[in-house]
Amino acid sequence: MTAAAAAGSSTSAPRVRANQLGWLPGVPAHATLVTDAVGPLPWSLMLDGREVARGLTTPRGHDASAGLDVHTIDVGPIDLEGDGFAIAADGAVSDPFAVRADLYAGLARDALRFFHLQRSGVEIGPEVAGEAYARPAGHVAGSPHGGDADVPCLPAGHAVTGDGVDLYEGWTGSHRLDVTGGWYDAGDHGKYVVNGGISVAQLLGACEWVGGTVPLPDGMERALRDEARWELEWLLRMRVPSGAQYAGLAHHKVSDERWTPIPTLPHEDPQPRYLHRPSTAATLNLVAAAAQGARVFATEDPEFAATLLEAAQASYAAALRHPDLLAPNTNVLANAGSGPYDDTDLRDEWYWAAVELYLATGDERRLEELRASDCHVGGPVDVFADIDWQRVGGLARLHLALVPSRLPEADAVRASATAAADAILATQAGQPFGHPYAPHDGRYDWGSNGLLLNQLTVLGAAWSLTGESRYRDGLAEGMDYVLGRNALGVSYVTGHGARSVHNQHSRWYAHQADPRLPHPPRGALSGGPNSATPDPVSAAAVGGLPAQQCFIDDIGAWGVNEITVNWNAPLVQVAALLAGAVRPAR
């Protein structure tokens, strides 16, 4: 199968692969040429058909991750601005693109607006993203089975495998909670504390340190705070009430009893909803996010900040009482109705919670705990490898480096962050498509685009800490891959690029399944290539292909083409950093 077919494109992508959105003026620009030519080839940069730069390509040989023979094109900084740029080489011409200082402002806003469109428990009006995306409130009182306004605990015996194993060991609870609100996690109706935790933390980080590094686009800080508060208030509702078993812990998730078909809009969901057993991981996510929220909202809303900090401290105490209550892998059930988000190594979650509480309070006990963690500087855990919902140590270390505190070893923490960024730049330099994601086994993981973007947040943090432009330059080049400089020549962000994906796995952005419904909104990031191709659609279409080609833009390909809040969150950070990365060219 050709790369174009794998991407679901009706025409072949041009052999010159470039960021389809464009480049920033004054920042080194790059592209990749697909060719089996052995020697260097001439290239030309065109603006409205007029040549404005030229040079020779650099042969890079066979890129195993892409399954292609390639050259790289290093254009250097461009001091012009315009919308009609293209690169020509070896008889091929790239898709047109722009060079503008404000290139990423629209993407930053769109990536953030995605969260508003994922809101549960509230009507989405046409003013948010247009009439096509307007919908009634989902999972509210009056919805089938009562929605999320009065949710019971999962009854005992509802999580028994075919082998007779009860994943929750007989657990249930007599309490019911109003867990209205929050974000739908992905393309289904589940809401998960561990995925919400890292996502809201990164939106808070966009306020706390991204906004201190570059000026945010107009109105974005207000929108960031509004979205963060929406999720934080939901996290607080997920706590087990006083007097119940596991009081103070956070329920791991609230979800449907069974998977719903595509399409199913939130307000039409017919499934009963249940609270799943609390987990230590979910609780520590709540602790960390609430403590960070207490810092961010301290000036704007001291009362809300105090509520968040009180909840963080109380739930931390509850986690100490139940340090190893793990969420099971519910995927082993025949029809689980929700993702498991299971995790057996909580060292990073404990570190993250202690870090955020220390940064919020200066508490010496939390300082002792974070310094004793395997995830702290000098410890055995490489916290910056594959930052994700299941590996949050790197996020904690970045916040410890970026947020002012009295930490005695602050210089060592900051040095560890910049050293990680240097390693990322070194990896990036070896990749002909300019991205820093290069697993040792050559296989791309689930959500590879999210993992890549989290590596870029490390570069952004290093740029914030040092002001060195090489980190900014690496940040910009890494984004090229997401927006079209890849083996398939596809932009993985809907509405941004000439060949952007538009059939991501979703139950309500489901135009492919029902033409009356919309495609995913502008700014929605696809999870991207996944070597495992775990769903039947991608397995049949692209299974076994080179890593970068293990992707298809199909609504049924949930293993490679889903949308989730935790992948869009680093997109918000990176796009916001790039939106303020340069001043307009003169």
Regions found by a protein language model. Give the residues of each.
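Helix-capping and short linker residues that terminate individual alpha-solenoid repeat units
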Residues: 211, 240, 298-299, 320, ...
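Proline/serine/threonine-rich low-complexity linkers at boundaries of modular beta-sandwich domains
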Residues: 8-11
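Hydrophobic, small-residue-rich alpha-helical packing segments that form membrane-like cores
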Residues: 313-317
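Solenoid-like repeat scaffolds
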Residues: 375-383
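Aromatic (Trp/Tyr) and acidic
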Residues: 17-91, 101, 111-197, 201, ...
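Short coil/linker segments at helix-helix boundaries
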Residues: 205-230, 267-274, 292-309
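Carboxylate/His-rich catalytic cores and anion/metal-binding grooves
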Residues: 223-246
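Short beta-strand edge segments in extracellular beta-sheet folds
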Residues: 98-104
